[in-house]
Design a protein with these regions (language model features):
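A short, active-site helix/loop in glycosyltransferases that binds the activated sugar's phosphate group
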Residues: 138-139, 177-201
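Conserved acidic donor-binding segment of nucleotide-sugar-dependent glycosyltransferases
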Residues: 344-355, 364-366
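A conserved mid-protein helix/loop that constitutes part of the nucleotide-sugar donor-binding site
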Residues: 20-25, 230-253, 259, 270-276
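Short acidic/histidine- and often glycine-rich active-site loop of Leloir-type glycosyltransferases
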Residues: 322, 335-345, 349-350
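Aromatic "clamp/platform" in nucleotide-sugar-dependent glycosyltransferases that forms part
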Residues: 293, 312
């Protein structure tokens, strides 16, 4: 009998998101005869947590969560917090680390200051994957605190558009054995920025089970408002990089041309209040519907008339791939991976990121 390989994936949580969904899909494809699967979560929580296969071993990574505030808030906030609590020596030490970071233009030393002394994962693995990458704390932890024969970084987005610590990423990924990138375009961009790492990179598309998506569409909720016009749908976290505000402006332009439309947004996030206020200020309260976060949005995807992905940047967009499982026309902005995903799609179009260009793309499927 062949010995199973122990493989470990590290990410932050299982809250609803593209990275988390892609992990669930990936784990469903791994052979249980070949792999003994382990998942580390900084916070073992989230609506997608029950979707992890029952044979997966879960590891809460308190090494990172105990320093969460220090790692994620601005360093000066941490230093001021130390001063307010009377920890003057710690504040001085942290301040000198902060100065080193500013001079070196990298926050590697800041993360190292907190994570260098943690114990790490006790077990040894054949493969360890920093799945939520590039993320400085995740990449650091897998690099130095997880014992494994092979270490893999996983890049889920366009690193030219997302604010990563390039110096730290170069250092850490230089110590990895392989770097998987979720789209051809994403790999090309990564290789241009990190020429010395290009021999380590390989495209690994996010996995989508078309049959599973269709099955879930049959049992999930869908539109229930008896609207008779055209329904446009966007699924994704309500945040600046996902482009919902531009989509609302595009809807305004389309309604001015007398199209009978209603735009539905599935998701939740930091921009929800701003988007609702924008819809109200533009007089679109009856034409914009916020449906909230849905673990299973596939009934909406199946029954919408047009699906729009207005993102500012992506890597390989999971929600776009899921929408393509159905027959509705798809409009996507020109983020990394969009053209890769929509190639050979008769009912798909890639447009620019302005409201005018998105509106024009939608209009192609209204006339």
């Amino acid at each position: 009998m062949v010995k199973k390989k122990k493989i470990f994936f590290l990410l932050y949580s299982m809250h609803v998101g593209g990275v988390e969904k892609s992990l669930v899909n990936l784990l469903s494809t791994l052979s249980r005869e070949e792999y003994d699967i382990h998942v580390g979560l900084v916070f073992p929580e989230g609506d997608l947590l029950p979707l992890l296969p029952p044979d997966v071993t879960l590891h809460p990574v308190t090494d990172i969560s105990q320093y969460w505030n220090e790692l994620k808030q601005p360093p000066l906030d941490t230093i001021c917090g130390y001063i307010r609590s009377g920890r003057i020596i710690r504040a001085l030490a942290a301040f000198f680390v902060y100065l080193r970071c500013k001079v070196g233009r990298s926050y590697y030393s800041w993360v190292d200051n907190f994570l260098r002394g943690v114990s790490g994962i006790e077990q040894t693995f054949d493969i360890a994957v920093a799945y939520a990458g590039p993320s400085l704390d995740i990449d650091y932890y897998v690099c130095y605190k997880v014992k494994a024969v092979q270490k893999i970084g996983w890049v889920h987005f366009d690193i030219s558009r997302f604010g990563i610590d390039r110096k730290a990423t170069r250092l850490l990924y230089g110590l990895y054995d392989r770097i998987y990138i979720v789209s051809e375009t994403g790999k090309k961009i990564f290789d241009q920025i990190y020429l010395e790492l290009r021999e380590k990179t390989k495209v690994y598309h996010n996995v989508i089970s078309v049959s599973s998506v269709h099955e879930q569409a049959c049992i999930g909720e869908s539109f229930c408002d008896d609207y008779k016009g055209k329904r446009i749908l966007t699924v994704g976290r309500i945040s600046p990089e996902k482009g919902q505000k531009v989509a609302i402006k595009a809807l305004k332009l389309l309604l001015e041309k007398k199209y009978d439309l209603r735009w539905y947004f599935v998701g939740d996030g930091s921009d929800m209040g701003t988007c609702k206020a924008m819809a109200e200020s533009l007089g679109l309260n009856d034409s914009v519907v916020f449906l909230g976060e849905k673990i299973n949005p596939y009934g909406f995807m199946r029954n919408c008339d047009i699906y729009v992905q207005p993102s500012r940047h992506e890597g390989y967009c999971i929600t776009l791939a899921e929408a393509l499982c159905f027959s509705c026309p798809v409009v996507a902005t020109r983020f990394t991976g969009a053209e890769d995903q929509l190639i050979n799609q008769d009912k798909g179009v890639v447009v620019g990121m302005s409201a005018e260009e998105i509106a024009s793309g939608v209009e192609l499927f209204l006339t």
